[in-house]
Amino acid sequence: MCRKKNIGTHSTYAQNWQTFTQLIMKTAYIVRAYRTAVGKAPRGLFRFKRPDELAAETVAHLMDSIPELDKKRIDDVIVGNAMPEAEQGLNMARLISLMGLETDTVPGVTVNRYCASGLETIAMATAKIQSGMAECIIAGGSESMSYIPFGGYKPVPDYELVKNGKEDYYWGMGLTAEAVAKEYNISREDQDAFSYDSHQKALAALKSDAFKDQIVSIHIEETYLEGNTKKTRNYVVDTDEGPRADTAIDKLAKLRPVFSAGGSVTAGNASQTSDGAAMVLVMSEDMVKELGVTPIARMVSYAAAGVPPRIMGIGPVAAIPKALKQAGMKQEDIELIELNEAFASQSLAVIRTLGLNSDIINVNGGAIALGHPLGCTGAKLSVQLFDEMKKRNNKYGMVTMCVGTGQGAAGIFERL
């Protein structure tokens, strides 16, 4: 029998293997990134726009921005979606590929990690390109909460789990936000103040056209009845619908809790239900050089982590350290953060627990003001991050969020 040569301790072997893989892994670059505006659900500006159409138009715009790329060279379209059923079912990513690229040669796959789905797709695209399994991938997310409500149309819990004390596996997100507020001592006043700030930052961003270069204009044709007459109107959506100029602390304080009697979580300090799509183009270094395109960013690391489902909102507390460790970075190295504001309570709990710098978090407002289109959010926040990092000349930024059923996710990006 041939004996294997002693190559040292497990630790030494692991270090050698890591060095080896780093040497052979390819570099993946993000070369384009766009999003739609975010519409309110269920009665907002995108209420008659299917999520596959919304994403397909975003893909088409992305392709128009890079005429050097032959669409038949795209290896895959990976789309995040949190509720993949009905209009979001039937492997929506493949339909988006067919409609947006107008070719049947590019496959598509739909991915679901709830609120982190859009970020997950960027990580998947990056990993596939780094490993040599692909050269060019469109990644992103699309969600219509106007068409498919949170939880879908027919959720079916495992009642055996519920009977055995695991009912928190199926808790609504609002209940988990209440649990976080209680466990982490987040007051109603602090939640409302956080929400007010989110709206003020978002309103300032809209006033200064901060999102202008990110947003794809979406044309809507709406058919309606006026009396017995069928009419059609056309309009363009190019501005986020969520921020409210009439938001005030005293108005927020008057809102009643909606998830728990005597609770502190209200419609005013929770994220909005929303519709939207966002797409990025990820490409190998070889293809970037061949086409002569300029990359805008690269994903340095990505991590997902598990936490107790009943306090799912603290997910980033577990995910952020993992992502930093992967990248060999410290918290202080991050210059800009997009933290998804699922709820003010969980956002504050994350910020305080990790000691994050509030001055660099959600500088243009967050989901409480701008909306949270579930499976789209991770990609949307990434698009916003890249654009704002460029304006501020930042080197490293991070996108992070909590995830339903007790998870967190974080992605670190380098601006190029």
Task: Cite the ranges covered by each PLM segment.
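N-terminal extracellular/periplasmic Venus flytrap/periplasmic-binding protein-like
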Residues: 35-37, 48, 52-57, 68, ...
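Active-site pocket-lining segment
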Residues: 214, 218, 300-369
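Active-site-proximal alpha-helical scaffold in enzymes
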Residues: 113-142, 181-210, 279-286, 351, ...
